[in-house]
Amino acid sequence: MKIKKRQYLIIPAMGFIFVGAMACSPATDQFSARSAAKGIPAGWSTGGLGMAGVDYDWIARFKDPQLMALVAEAMKRNPDLKATAERVRRAEAVARLSGAEKKPQLNAQVNSLQQKQRFPGFPIKLGSNNAEAYGASLDVNWEPDLWGRLRASQAAAAAESMAFAEDYRSARASLAGQLAKAWFALGEAAEQVILAEAAVGVRVKTVASVQERFAAALEGGLASQLRLAETDLASSRASLALWESERARAIRQLELLIGRFPEGNIPEPHRLPGAPSVPPAGLPSELLKRRPDIIAAERRYEAAGLRRGAARAARYPSFSLTGRSGTSTSAFEDVLDRGFGIWSLAGSVAQPLFAGGRLKEEERIAGHDEVIALQELQGTILRAFAEVEQALVAEEFYARREAAVLESATSARKAAEASILDFADGAVDALTLLAAQDRQVQTAFQLVSLRRMRLENRINLHLALGGDFQTQVLP
């Protein structure tokens, strides 16, 4: 009877320990980018450029069906993006695996034992003793999560999984941005090739005109002017070769980003599109909820804090329950007979006493990891704000520069056209003609490059704002 009384005392005591331990389980801290960010301004420094709203489907803003088709193809074929998607799936599997540790473990077991024992050394021959034993059982093992260690580990794995999902969003946006920039670089090269071909044609005619006047000895000192005209022609041919090379390079860069074999088989755009309207920038505080890199850093900060809690809980006592139910018999045919049934139930409490300082240092390391994650989150937030501010300010300057260069290019074109007529009439010398033509060529090249740079800055602004676009399914 004493044994029974002790059993009745042990069970309530373990229940008391379990309930008390659950009450002592540490609460999980809330980790957010807003709490990590310091001194978020009420608005952007550019004022009017930062309109309210959300930047949806920024690829469609360029109104280029071919670009949209290439982006959609890249989302399906790019191997780097596929690898990032697999990392997301792997992180999700790790999170599910971490959750499995909280559940009871059930194992089926079948055993067989055959034993033979001899009795040597006796005055009479006793022979030997043969014994057989068979059994089947179901074993259950469960470790109740007294201090929240397993719960914190599972939550940390889930937060890490969400961070990888945001990494995928970030990689997806980055790929779209790189592809759009490569597409516009191809558009610039195509336009520059056309301009270079036109410049070669014009300068061939100029060389012929100067050569004609030189042969007729209409002016003194035309030999040097003829050489200058020939120099400009050679320079234009070099520019043409350069831009043809840039066009081929841009095509292969596009194919690489898409995931195609780089064979130079992409139809090039006829010209660069105009810059669309400035996207809505919203409020700086809203950026914390849109940028995938900020959200990923936020989730990693959360995971680090949860792992710190799990490391702290690992220093507390652990409680485990084991149970077995089955049969044990000397005859194999009786293995499934309940009349030979056995069962057992055991509980244990273990308190780490000495581990060479390992548990303490693991908690310290987890604390350092949490501080590192916080600093990385704050750095990500600052970089995000800087990228938006820089893109908004650059947009203002690019708009002013494009207007000024457009005016300059228009004036240079008119001056070159007038100088051709004046040169034919003998009103100006070849130097004036060559200078006017060179100014026209250079301003035309500059205008195309500036338009491409403005489009690239617009892409940077879309990415900095955490803008989204279509075709969001994992490849």
Feature locations, PLM:
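Terminal intrinsically disordered/low-complexity segments used for targeting and assembly
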Residues: 1-76, 134, 158, 241-289, ...
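Hydrophobic membrane-targeting signal helices
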Residues: 18-23, 202, 349-350
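Small/polar-residue-enriched beta-strand and adjacent coil segments characteristic
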Residues: 57, 65, 70, 101-170, ...
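Amphipathic alpha-helical coiled-coil segments
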Residues: 83-98, 171, 175-198, 202-207, ...
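Glycine-focused motif/segment detector
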Residues: 217-219, 426
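Alpha-solenoid helical repeat architecture
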Residues: 221-225
